Amino acid sequence: MNQTAEKPVLVSVQNLHKNYGDLAAVRGLSFDIFQGEVFGLLGPNGAGKTTTIEIIEGLRQPDGGRVRVCGLDPAQESMSLKERIGAQLQSTVLPDKMRVDEALRLFAGFYRRSASVEALLERFGLKEKRHTFFEKLSGGQKQRLALALALVNEPEMVLLDEPTVGLDPQLRRDIYALIERFRSEGRTVLLTTHYIEEAERLCDRVAIMDRGQLVALGTPRELITRSGQGTRLELRLAKPVGLERLKVIDGVIDCHEAEGAYFLRAQPPAVTIAALVRFLEADDNALVDLHIARPSLEDVFVEMTGRRMEA
């Protein structure tokens, strides 16, 4: 049994619908998020991700279906819910002349319970920037401040909308470490991202949306295995061989030739590689070069939506 299935459900979305005039932004969406997991919501632009998150957060009213977050109805109990969740939005912008510690104290005053400002400054590496104006912060420092503001009320769940957009690889890794720390503390994280490798690294489970509907749900590994994409093999041989002979090797899904190399998709790859070695020995042929690439969440995304993730 999946370990998450043994944990309490923190977010329940059942048959959710939301329309904007004649446009159905969300159509019959259902999923659960378990306590303590990092849950990724993926989809191309216009898939309905933002609308779904806004409904979960209590910012929009659904037209149909049932949503519960921390046991509360976001549409009817939004004030109570705000005490229990934190949200870091991509467009977080503070006044240019607001200092870091002022922002934290301001946000702390919005809640009945709040974390220590000093502890937040220490935790997010902002202690030396406490008196710095927002306009003087780097992109990475602004993102760390946004995360600190999302945790100012010690929430059970954090909603992160594109938390690493625009950051260089090292700063993205710093944010990854913070998100992994959230999970180690038992917090639930709902994450949207345009970086497939980010979802594959951070998320316990992901939901892929397209045109307002759920098209895939599971752990990254489950989705990759379930997709039947197969492992990609690129090989160069001592002597040419006909594609029709490669296609009948055990486990080969399809193959093609380009620029003197043979490209195979195989499932399971171990069976195909063993059969390939036997085939080459019998044919008095040999491998000159072999590259193996396992399928990725990007492959699943393209298969499900017909589009690549917009970075």
Give names to the regions the model predicted.
Residues 176-267:
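ABC transporter nucleotide-binding domain
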Residues 8-11, 18-210, 214-216:
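ABC transporter nucleotide-binding domains
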Residues 1-17, 307-311:
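ABC-family P-loop ATPase nucleotide-binding domain
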Residues 253-311:
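Non-catalytic connector elements of ABC transporters
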Residues 18, 31, 124, 233-237, ...:
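Preference for bulky hydrophobic residues occupying beta-strand positions
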Residues 86, 108, 112, 207, ...:
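A generic structural signal for secondary-structure junctions
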